[in-house]
């Protein structure tokens, strides 16, 4: 893909995101319009394409659940998740401050989380995902968001995050693993908090706090 086509793809993707979200939220409480946010994200992404930049994977969602594979620290191209033909993105406020975050992912690749802080685009995280597209949920009650990743057919990991003052904080990782049915028809479920086996009651306390009232945010795709 030549440089001109890459720039065109970035502009089309961001304009599509703006047109998708504007009917819902046209003006932000913080005083930044979505068109201004789109401009800042576009400029930053075009810079990263014109001057390719390597960044380290900040977290591997597989390893957070104690599963095999950990690419944390591996260097990857920053621009790739948002300019591939397989790119999917989310454009919405995940912190409750009225400023939209920008998430981009390639299935089986990395998930990039961007925000705008003090009128500058910041890379909050570069997450290694699994072969299955992760789901993103937002909880308006406490302004947290959750990235749910299917590690295997029997293991799901829910990583809870919060954005404050231009920084990303991971509050908890809730994982549940479904075991094999025994001869009596019982299917065991093991529950983990931050990679450690915990009781059902403790797991449910965290789940109720962060996940009970969350709503899914749909990905938009470059192929749509």
Outline where the language-model segments fall.
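Acidic/hydrophobic-patterned starts of short beta strands in beta-sheet-rich repeat architectures
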Residues: 95-105, 141-148
């Amino acid at each position: 893909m030549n440089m001109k086509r890459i720039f065109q793809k970035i502009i089309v993707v961001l304009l599509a995101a703006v047109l998708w979200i504007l009917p819902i939220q046209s003006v932000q409480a913080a005083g930044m319009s979505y068109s201004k946010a789109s401009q800042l994200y576009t400029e930053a992404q075009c810079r990263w394409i014109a001057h390719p930049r390597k960044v380290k994977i900040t977290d591997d969602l597989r390893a957070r659940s104690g599963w095999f594979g950990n690419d944390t620290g591996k260097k990857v191209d920053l621009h790739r998740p948002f300019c591939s033909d397989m790119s999917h993105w989310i454009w919405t406020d995940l912190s409750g401050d009225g400023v939209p975050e920008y998430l981009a992912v390639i299935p089986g690749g990395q998930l990039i989380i961007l925000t705008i802080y003090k009128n500058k685009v910041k890379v909050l995280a570069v997450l290694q995902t699994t072969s299955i597209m992760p789901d993103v949920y937002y909880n308006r009650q406490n302004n947290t968001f959750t990235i749910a990743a299917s590690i295997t057919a029997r293991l799901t990991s829910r990583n809870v995050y919060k954005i404050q003052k231009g920084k990303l904080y991971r509050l908890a990782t809730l994982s549940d693993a479904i075991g094999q049915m025994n001869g009596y028809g019982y299917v065991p479920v093991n529950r983990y908090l931050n990679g450690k086996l915990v009781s059902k009651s403790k797991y449910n306390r965290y789940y109720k706090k962060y996940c009970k009232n969350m709503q899914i945010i749909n990905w938009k795709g470059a192929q749509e």
